[in-house]
Structures are given as structure tokens and as C-alpha cells.
Amino acid sequence: MSIGIDIAAIGMVTAVGLDAPSACAAMRARLDGFQETRFLGPGGQWLIGAPVPLPRDWIGEKRMAHLAGAAICEAFESAPEARGQTALILCLAEENRPGRPVADGARLLRHIAEIVDVEPHARSRIINHDRASGHVALEQARRMISSGEAPYVMIAGVDSYLTPLAI
């Protein structure tokens, strides 16, 4: 019999909301955040995408770190007891995908830890299984909690298709 896991807190940063309550309300209202991007398509027309409106114009890994970091900070606000004792499972795009915005997952993990202002947990890890990453992460989180490897596990996913190589 496998042990159950509880969701203690959530955080979200999306094209329609920079926190979970805003993003969920926008999605319930069927907002999607799609608009013209700064990328030109083959016909010379602006491509449509759903960029996240961050306060600064960060790009690449720095942008990914701030997207994930903001969602993680939001989750820690709801569960402050987890701060400093949470293993992070970071879900990223598969390593061979053209335009993947993250070149070095371990470096991204460290950058996120700096933004969140916590030491990286020894059991933190990266999963690169594309759309299946969330399912893989849930199973790994369940195992980590049931074995006592970590009292808390946070699963975060960050990605973008709005990169020159992806387009």
C-alpha cells in the first residue's frame, strides 16, 4: 500500500496571473493571456503567444529562475514551516528540445535557491520528461516523504516556448 501525500501550499506564475488566486480566477473566467509577442513569424507577422508579464525584462535562465522563484515564494508564504527543509523537484523541458530556455538545470536550481533565499536541499532534483514530468515528480515526492528523505517536497515546473530557437 502506498502512502498518500498532502498538498500544503501552492504557488503560480502564469500569463494570466502572477499568483495562484489571480491565475485561478483568470482561468475560471476563461482568460488565456494570448497576445502578439516580440517574435516575427515566417510571413513577417507578429507571432501569438502567452508571455508572463514580469516586472523586469529578464530572458533565458534568469527569467525561468524568477518565474519558478516567485511561485515557490508564494507557496512558502502559506507554509512557512516548510522553508529550509523542503526538497525541490524541478520539472524542465527535455534536454534535447530545440529552444529549451535552460542550458544547465543544476545552475538554475542554485539560482532559484538564491531568489527564494534558502539553501538547496540535498535531495532536490531535476526531472526532464516533458509532459510526463509532473507524474514522475509526484511519484518521486511520495517516495521521498514515505522514506523520510525529506519532510516536505515542492514540485515546480518552468518552461517557455517563446525563445528564438523554439520559434
Model-found features: residue ranges?
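Active-site histidine-anchored catalytic micro-motif
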Residues: 135-138, 152-153
